[in-house]
Amino acid sequence: DEKYITGDASYYEKYMKFAEILPQLVGNPIYIWCALELKRYFDIDEPLTAANAQEIYDRTKKLITEKHMTRRWCMEHSNVRLVSTTEDPIDDLRYHKVLNEEKMFTRVITAFRPDKAMFCANADFAAYLAKLSAAAEQPIDSFAEMLTALEKRLQYFQQITGTTVSDDGIPYFNWADYTPAEVEGIFAKARSGGKLTQHEIDQYQSAFLFEMARIYNRNHYVMQLHIGTYLDANTSHVKSVGQSTGFDCCDDAAPVKGVGELLNNLTTIGELPKTIIYPLDGTKIETWAI
């Protein structure tokens, strides 16, 4: 019953339903994670079931209070030295500034995620450029100016958190040759709300990823490409709560040739940054590893 998953049932009711179903999840990582958390943080060896759910609820609640088990407590006692969030270039990183001042045991950085500037066919592309312009405190009237704004924000991210990693999500990617003039024309067309052909989208994204990689390289960033993201799978929920709120999932696309051409072209000019590539589809790991 969805009521006990994302519905309006209380957290206690959802917990009891979770305990009821957990014994049937043997072989699923959730079963292992639950057992690990009970042992690691509460020293409880018993498997969680409907029969002992109330007892475990009471014991863990008491321990949480006695040990002041906050999220930070859990990270420190798990010896978590580094946590990386991921933020859009327009983010002001206010909470990262607060964390820096508090000198936590766990270091918290962010990964630079410029996806929205890559998705030129999105209806909100022009609106996003206006926000990026405000964040970078400069006009953006061309593809070149957008790249300058993104580099300024990347350097700001590095200054605030010390990060040296990007987070580029690629749903699918075909390399398409382009000229600077063609890309500027596509940028202008997208910014004005014009309908782009698939070839134009491929050209723009090729130019975007190529130029961002060069920016990463000269700023000593690691380029992280996670590939095969199926974005906004639940459109009704995306409309109600926004993008990047839990409604993306794994696709089975494997744009090996496109990414290969991108990396080859960067290698040819000697500007390939350190790179991490991983597919969201676990069955494609061997494809990308080799």
Feature names for model-found ranges:
Residues D1-N219, E271-I290:
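Metal-cofactor-binding active-site regions of metalloenzymes
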